[in-house]
Amino acid sequence: MKIGFYNIQGGTGKTTVAANFAYILSQSVKTILIDCDIYGGTTAVLFGLEDKEHNLNTYLAGDSAIEDIIYHYDDLAIIHTDVSSKVFGYKSDLNRFETLVKELEEEYDVIIYDFPPNITEDNPLIGYVGEFELVNKVVVVGEDSIPSIVNSLKTIELITDLGIGLTGIIVNKYRGLTDISEIIDDVIGVLPYDQNVERQWVESTPIVKIKTKFTKEMTALANEIASIYLEKDLASLRALRLAKAISELTEVEKSEKDFEDYLE
C-alpha cells in the first residue's frame, strides 16, 4: 500500500502529519517513509539524520545504493533528503525512483510519501503520472485558513484530474477560524493547533512520542485511517506475497526433484 501526503501549498504541516502518521503505522505494520522533496525536504531534521552521508539525492545521482539510503528510527524505516545547499548541485535521474519504489514494495507493507508542494516533473507525484502506479491513495494536508482552503480545493481537483485515488483532506493547525465542513466535503480529520509540535524539530523526535493534545488526535486519526483504508488492502497484499512465496518454493522443489531424477 502506497499513500502520499500532498498539497500544492507549502507550510501546512504536511511533513509533520506524514512523518507522525508513518511512525504510528510502523508500530503495527512494516512501514517506510520517503521524503520526496529533493530541494526543500526536512524529514532529516525531524529524525536527526542531517549528518548522514547517503540520502535520496545521492541515490538519484547514482552515488548511493538503495540499502545505503534506508535509516531507522525505532521501527520506522526512513529515506530522507539532503538538508544542505548541496541539493542544488546534484544530478537527479528520476528513473531510479521507479526502481527504488518497486524494490521497496517487495519489502514493506506500507510506503508513505511526503510529496513536495509543487507541480513540476521533479515531484514524483507529477512526473510519474500514467507510467506506473506510484501511489494508491493521496491525503491532502491543509490548514485552518481561507488561503489554505482555496489551495486545498485546487489540490483535490488536481489529484482527481490526475486519476489518483483521493483519501480526503486532513485539516491541520485547527483553531476554529473557519467552518471547514461547510466548504469541503472530503474532510477525514481535524488536528488542533498545538505549539508543542515545534518541539519535535528541536528534540529530533516525532511529536507523537511526546504527550500533547496533538498526539492524542493524531494517533486516533492514524488508527482510524488505517482501519478504514489499510486493513483490507494489507490482507490482500500479504495473501499475494504468501501465494508468490509458495509458488517460488514449489518451483524450487520441482527443480530439485528434476535434478534428482536426472542423477538417477
Curated annotation (Swiss-Prot):
An annotated Gene Ontology molecular function: ATP binding
Amino acids binding ATP: 8-15
Pfam families linked to this entry: AAA_31
Name assigned to this protein: Uncharacterized ATP-binding protein MJ0410
PANTHER family: ATPASE INVOLVED IN CHROMOSOME PARTITIONING, PARA_MIND FAMILY, SEPTUM SITE-DETERMINING PROTEIN MIND HOMOLOG, CHLOROPLASTIC-RELATED
Gene Ontology CC entries for this record: cytoplasmic side of plasma membrane; cytosol
Keywords: ATP-binding, Nucleotide-binding
